[in-house]
Structures are given as structure tokens and as C-alpha cells.
Amino acid sequence: MKKTILSLLALSAFGISQAQYVVVITENYVIANAENNGDTEQPKNCVGEELSKAELIALIDSGQDYSQACINTITNMSGVFSGKSVDYDITGWDTAHVQYFGGMFSDSTSFNQDISGWDMSSGIDFSYMFKGATSFNQPIGLWNVGNGITFKAMFQGATAFNQPIDTWNVSKSKNFQNMFTSATAFNQPLNSWNVSSGEEFSQMFQNTRDFNQPLNNWDMSNAKFMSYMFATTQSFNQPLNNWNTAKGFNFSSMFYNATAFNQNISNWDTSSAGMYNSFYVGSALNSANVPAKFR
């Protein structure tokens, strides 16, 4: 390993006792050591050269240790562990510059590391991030996802996930499609979310087994697509009468086979609705609780 040693000799002519200062610079470490007192070197947060995404994937596929890989300049992590096991500790990775997390752990069925400390503040795409990650259940509620514009299918099929994420700032997101589809264990509060930018909500809670949380505070004023949003839900039965559905176009099968739902939503504004076939077929909804246009 290459080293450069700079020795400075303080001369007595300057009224300073003789002392030696050593600066040691290696490929992976930098340390300033006063009087060369034998202090140990302090590592940076990674070891080696900065990697590109392609180089990181090659390292992962090689089976070598990537726990301290230098990924600080990678902005796109989409799919890097898709369908793969994560065999080394990545909890210390610096993700501060990553914008795209799409499918990062999709179908990584054994992944369950605590990545709650990751810096997600640059993230804009969280789509499919944990899709099919059937073991993942870590406390990521403190993530800063405030720049996220899509959460499509983020937890689809993540059957173990059941962590509070109600403090997330999702106010910039336009797409929530399939976000919790078949996330059968998920049952956490979401009523505080600001979804006012959301346009796409299709299949968001489809086939959720346990989810039954209030959503009546949601600002749905920009929602256009809500097909299958609560289809085949088994527990959901919460009031939604406060929703502003004036821009809603596609309501097809929204409550299809929603076997528990029977709330009065007859006041919904359906003036923009163009698709609403099978709106409540197979559900527990009483026709009197259905918007007149959809009966």
C-alpha cells in the first residue's frame, strides 16, 4: 500500500521544543498524527475506489465482501439486489446521493437488514423497492422520503412488513399504485399522510389481509385512478365519506370482493367518472351506500 510521510521538524530556533508531526496518507485512510504517538488509523466509511453501479453489481455477483464498498457517488441503485440474497452487512452504506431505489431489493426473499439509518433524502423513485421481499420488516419510519415522486409497488408482496411509516412526507408523490398490494401483514396508521399530489391509487391496498386503518383525512382532490384500490381486502372497513373524488375517472372494481367494507360513500362526487364497472361486486357494500351513478 502506497504511503506518503511528511515530517515536520520544529526547530528550537523558534523557541519550540523539537517535535515530529507525521501525516500518513494511504489509499483508504487519512490520519494526522501529532508527535507520532502511535494512535491507530481511522477508516473512512468505505474501503477502495469509488464504484460505478456496474462495478458494484459485478462485485456483488462475484461473491466478494461489499460491506464497505464505496458507493457514495452512485445515484441509481435500481435492481442491484433484485432476486439476490444480501450476504454482507450493508447497513453502513452511504446512500446520501442515491435518487433511484426502484426494485433495489425486489424478490430478495431473505433480506431483512436494519437499514433504518440510511440517508434517503435524495431519493425520488422508491417503486418496487421491497416488492416480494418477503422477510423484510425493519423500522424505516424515520426515513426522509420527502423528495419521493413515486412509491409504486414499494411493498407489494412484502408479506412480513408491518412497521409504522405514518411520519413519512409523501406530499410530492403522484403515484401510489400497488404500494401495499398483498402486503398481508401491514396494518399501520396512514391517516396523517399528505397525498394531495397523488393521481394514481389503483390497487394500492388490493389483497391486504389485515389492513384496517382510518384514511378519511386524505386529500384525494387530485386522484384520477382508483381501480381495484380496495379489491379483495379482508378487513378494511373505515369511513371514506370525506374524500374529494371530483377528479376521479377510473373507479372500476374499486371494492371488488372487499368482504368487510360497508361504509356510506353515497356522497362522493362522481361527475368525472368514466369507468366504474364492477365497482362493488362481491363486496359487503349495501347499494344505498354506493354513489347513485355506480349502482
Predicted regions: what they are:
Residues 14-16:
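N-terminal signal peptide c-region/cleavage motif recognized by signal peptidases
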Residues 7-9:
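Sec-dependent N-terminal signal peptides
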Residues 1-4:
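Positively charged n-region of N-terminal signal peptides that target proteins for export
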Residues 18-295:
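Negatively charged
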